[in-house]
């Protein structure tokens, strides 16, 4: 959604805090770095919400090279330790996770949406402008299907599209638990990693499992070098 304004970055730095910003391309990353952003979050097209078109495995090393030595976090498709290991093998100094928290026990995700996510595969998401006016990855639903029809007007740009759809979304979410029509319409932002989010876990267990799998992946690769 753009580079943070200079006055905002200065204010945060004056408070002794760091600034991080998302990017979907090397050129966006360069703008962030030149503006004084401390951490670049390179988010691939697999990610939920607003995202670019370039896949994570291609994007991460490009951004790392573009902004070095500014630290980069890999994002987009991160929900397992092996994916974390892949990001760090490609030069990232850590990872940024979003979607994986939406089905945790602590998440305040709409109950119907959470059930949809738990049942979804990685093919059940798409990039749509139907909620915000900008391309954003979300669950496919009757809502996205209707907006994609050839006889439907194109979504308005941001911020007009959210103004247009906010009341409808509010009513859909309120009715989704008791009305099958609303249940088909309800959706939310989520990345392709949703296909691995098939059970409800605590946030603690998500972190624990990710770290354990990361260690196993790194040790397996190290063992191959020893052989």
Question: Model regions: which residues?
Answer:
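Alpha/beta enzyme core
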Residues: 1-73, 80-99
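Conserved active-site-proximal phosphate/metal-binding subdomains
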Residues: 58-73, 79-227
């Amino acid at each position: 959604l753009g580079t943070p304004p200079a006055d905002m970055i200065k204010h945060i730095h004056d408070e002794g805090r760091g600034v991080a910003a998302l990017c979907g391309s090397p050129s966006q990353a360069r703008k962030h770095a030149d503006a004084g952003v401390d951490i670049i979050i390179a988010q691939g097209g697999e990610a939920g919400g607003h995202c670019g078109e370039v896949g994570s495995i291609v994007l991460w090393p490009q951004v790392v090279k573009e902004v070095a030595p500014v630290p980069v976090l890999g994002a987009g498709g991160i929900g397992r330790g092996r994916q974390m290991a892949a990001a760090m093998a490609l030069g990232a100094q850590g990872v940024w996770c979003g979607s994986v928290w939406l089905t945790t026990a602590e998440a305040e995700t709409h109950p119907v949406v959470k059930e949809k996510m738990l049942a979804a595969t990685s093919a059940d998401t798409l990039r749509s402008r139907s909620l915000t006016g900008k391309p954003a990855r979300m669950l496919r639903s009757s809502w996205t299907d209707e907006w994609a029809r050839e006889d439907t007007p194109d979504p308005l740009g941001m911020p007009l599209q959210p103004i247009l759809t906010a009341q409808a979304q509010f009513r859909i979410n309120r009715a989704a638990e008791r009305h099958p029509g609303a249940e088909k319409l309800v959706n939310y932002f989520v990345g392709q990693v949703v296909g691995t989010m098939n059970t409800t876990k605590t946030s603690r267990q998500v972190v624990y499992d990710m770290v354990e799998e990361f260690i196993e992946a790194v040790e397996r690769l190290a063992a191959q070098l020893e052989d």
